UniProtKB/Swiss-Prot annotation:
<feature type="binding site">
    <location>
        <position position="81"/>
    </location>
    <ligand>
        <name>Zn(2+)</name>
    </ligand>
</feature>
<feature type="binding site">
    <location>
        <position position="80"/>
    </location>
    <ligand>
        <name>Mg(2+)</name>
    </ligand>
</feature>
<keyword id="KW-0479">Metal-binding</keyword>
<comment type="pathway">
    <text>Amino-acid biosynthesis; L-histidine biosynthesis; L-histidine from 5-phospho-alpha-D-ribose 1-diphosphate: step 3/9.</text>
</comment>
<dbReference type="GO" id="GO:0005737">
    <property type="term" value="C:cytoplasm"/>
</dbReference>
<keyword id="KW-0368">Histidine biosynthesis</keyword>
<keyword id="KW-0460">Magnesium</keyword>
<keyword id="KW-0028">Amino-acid biosynthesis</keyword>
<dbReference type="GO" id="GO:0000287">
    <property type="term" value="F:magnesium ion binding"/>
</dbReference>
<protein>
    <recommendedName>
        <fullName>Phosphoribosyl-AMP cyclohydrolase</fullName>
        <ecNumber>3.5.4.19</ecNumber>
    </recommendedName>
</protein>
<dbReference type="GO" id="GO:0004635">
    <property type="term" value="F:phosphoribosyl-AMP cyclohydrolase activity"/>
</dbReference>
<dbReference type="InterPro" id="IPR038019">
    <property type="entry name" value="PRib_AMP_CycHydrolase_sf"/>
</dbReference>
<dbReference type="InterPro" id="IPR026660">
    <property type="entry name" value="PRA-CH"/>
</dbReference>
<keyword id="KW-0862">Zinc</keyword>
<dbReference type="InterPro" id="IPR002496">
    <property type="entry name" value="PRib_AMP_CycHydrolase_dom"/>
</dbReference>
<dbReference type="Pfam" id="PF01502">
    <property type="entry name" value="PRA-CH"/>
</dbReference>
<feature type="binding site">
    <location>
        <position position="82"/>
    </location>
    <ligand>
        <name>Mg(2+)</name>
    </ligand>
</feature>
Length: 134
């Protein structure tokens, strides 16, 4: 007998048992980051109201903010029309979601056209990462 919640049956995980998860600021709509979740991290997120992801590089649960203090309180979980992407509407503690010390991981914008285009940093570092991760 499974202890998995009934709603989990609607979630489509990939062959590795993962689903992409987009974290969005619940107040202003800014996209903060994209990460991955597995069944365990999604269930823990839903149960606790705190964002928990799956770290593909470390192969373990990543409780957002456990090292940096920049946890995400989840206001709402949404599932897309195909059931294969999760959207988390969150409050970002400390206003920093990115390991680079920025509010969002999407801090570079493509400027220019075609062959002359280049990625330009458009958002400032709010806190030196060396002061965040000790």
């Amino acid at each position: 007998m499974s202890t998995e919640p009934d709603w989990m049956a609607d979630v489509v995980f990939d062959a590795d048992g993962l689903i992409p998860a987009i974290a969005q600021d619940a107040e202003n709509g800014q996209i903060l980051m994209v990460a991955w979740m597995n069944r365990e991290s999604l269930a823990e997120t839903a149960a606790t109201g705190r964002a928990v992801y799956w770290s593909r590089s470390r192969k373990k649960l990543w409780r957002k903010g456990e090292e940096s203090g920049h946890a995400q309180q989840v206001h709402e979980l949404r599932l897309d029309c195909d059931g294969d992407v999760i959207l988390l509407k969150v409050h970002q503690n400390g206003g920093i979601a990115c390991h680079t010390g920025r509010a969002s991981c999407f801090y570079r914008r493509l400027d220019g056209t075609s062959q002359r285009a280049a990625w330009v940093t458009v958002d400032p570092v709010l806190k030196d990462p060396e002061l965040i991760y000790k």
